[in-house]
């Protein structure tokens, strides 16, 4: 299994890290077969596979359910699972209880927490032996406040983002995800930090990149962000379903090629 130390070595050797956001067994199995370095089980599963309006409705049980499936599909890949909104920032006791449950039940390598306001949680979870990945910049759980826009785009905001990145590392974060940040700022933060920095919409100067499986394969997604490159196309699923519907209605499926041919009625008459 790929360990955290392998990811640190990759940063040290300037070898780019690949991360894919996956939510289920089949996609995780494909990611591992493709030798993707890390898998993120993001709370974006709420919109992508559960049909919610936002990540706000995603529960801890949702994350555990999907995290387990991903681990079964990718037993040898470094897996990070999101702590959904409402599971941290409550109290020290409850925060750690939720983090430990997610970490243990999914058999993840780390949990992810959004925002610099969770410094205390990162410190305490790390002390308990729970590796924490931090997420700064555009944080989906706060998008209702921030809006879907680039972060760190003013002098003051850039300084704050640098300070926050250094603070989460100091608190014990083992990795940082930077989302929707100016490329030069993301590169500077990656250079300053010792921990791996994974970018999404943050340019090529970070230590690695993350894209959502469904986005990069055009699988059920109506809109893609500017920073998403499409590497495949699963959008013809509707056409396939329409063809299936047509063939069944017209009696063309199943044909002989898809039918067990043993004749049993004669045996029943004996």
Curated annotation (Swiss-Prot):
Any one GO molecular-function label of the UniProt entry: magnesium ion binding
Residues of the active site: 179 (proton acceptor)
Cofactor note: Binds 1 Mg(2+) ion per subunit.
Record localization: Cytoplasm
Lineage: superkingdom: Bacteria
EC number: 2.1.2.11
Transmembrane portions of the chain: none
Pathway assignment: Cofactor biosynthesis; (R)-pantothenate biosynthesis; (R)-pantoate from 3-methyl-2-oxobutanoate: step 1/2
Key words, A-Z: Cytoplasm, Magnesium, Metal-binding, Pantothenate biosynthesis, Transferase
Example GO BP: pantothenate biosynthetic process
Gene3D superfamilies: Phosphoenolpyruvate-binding domains
Residues annotated as binding 3-methyl-2-oxobutanoate: 43-44, 82, 112
Keyword Transferase included in the entry's annotation: yes
Known catalytic reactions: 3-methyl-2-oxobutanoate + (6R)-5,10-methylene-5,6,7,8-tetrahydrofolate + H2O = 2-dehydropantoate + (6S)-5,6,7,8-tetrahydrofolate
One GO CC term on file: cytoplasm
Required cofactor names: Mg(2+)
Alphabetized SUPFAM superfamilies for the sequence: Phosphoenolpyruvate/pyruvate domain
Principal subcellular localisation of the protein: cytoplasm
Task of the protein: Catalyzes the reversible reaction in which hydroxymethyl group from 5,10-methylenetetrahydrofolate is transferred onto alpha-ketoisovalerate to form ketopantoate.
Classification via PANTHER family: 3-METHYL-2-OXOBUTANOATE HYDROXYMETHYLTRANSFERASE (PTHR20881:SF0)
Known partners and oligomeric status: Homodecamer; pentamer of dimers.
Name the record gives this protein: 3-methyl-2-oxobutanoate hydroxymethyltransferase
Organism lineage: Bacteria, Bacillati, Bacillota, Bacilli, Bacillales
